[in-house]
């Protein structure tokens, strides 16, 4: 089963494709970044959706896991992120019919055992769980991988119908 993990953002969107095999574990297939240029909001959203579309067309994706919007102090930032999330949700629903959402707290808890972990602790566990060497940059990619791992753990524990 291939899981697409997505860390949506208005400037960069991290994505990761994780192959989940219940017997052999997880293997990272691909991870990358969709960079969004400074343009009008409408063009940024279009560029974002086109980037996701390209990933979906180039890979056989079975399930999608998305990191939920975190709390931001700036209401304009929340509104902008919500617009990106709405476009992403529509695209995934049109192509696959369903997706799963995980809060940053759920992701941190799934990978490190507690919800107060910092980004470096999450990055360490991502590398350890997948047997990766070197640093994964930027953190948007690490977060996308972490979301995909969280989803695979939920499947393994029987918490999600497949």
Curated annotation (Swiss-Prot):
Binding locations of Mg(2+) 1: 7, 140
Pfam families tied to this protein: RuvC
Catalysed reactions, semicolon-separated: Endonucleolytic cleavage at a junction such as a reciprocal single-stranded crossover between two homologous DNA duplexes (Holliday junction)
CDD domains listed in its UniProt record: RuvC
Main location: cytoplasm
NCBIfam families to which the protein is assigned, alphabetical: ruvC
Protein name (database record): Crossover junction endodeoxyribonuclease RuvC
Native source species: Wolinella succinogenes (strain ATCC 29543 / DSM 1740 / CCUG 13145 / JCM 31913 / LMG 7466 / NCTC 11488 / FDC 602W) (Vibrio succinogenes)
Lineage: Bacteria, Pseudomonadati, Campylobacterota, Epsilonproteobacteria, Campylobacterales
Gene name of the encoded protein: ruvC
């Amino acid at each position: 089963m291939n899981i697409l993990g997505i860390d949506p953002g208005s400037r960069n969107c991290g994505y990761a494709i994780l192959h989940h095999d219940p017997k052999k574990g997880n293997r990272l297939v691909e991870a990358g970044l969709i960079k969004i240029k400074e343009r009008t909001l409408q063009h940024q959203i279009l560029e974002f959706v086109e980037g996701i579309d390209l990933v979906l067309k180039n890979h056989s994706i079975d399930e999608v896991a998305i990191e939920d919007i975190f709390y931001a102090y700036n209401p304009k930032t929340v509104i902008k992120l919500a617009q990106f999330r709405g476009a992403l949700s529509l695209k995934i629903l049109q192509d696959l019919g369903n997706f799963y959402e995980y809060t940053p707290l759920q992701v941190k808890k799934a990978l490190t055992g507690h919800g107060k972990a910092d980004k470096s602790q999450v990055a360490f566990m991502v590398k350890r769980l997948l047997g990766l060497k070197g640093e994964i940059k930027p953190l948007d990619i690490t977060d996308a991988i972490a979301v995909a791992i969280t989803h695979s753990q939920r499947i393994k524990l029987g918490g999600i119908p497949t």
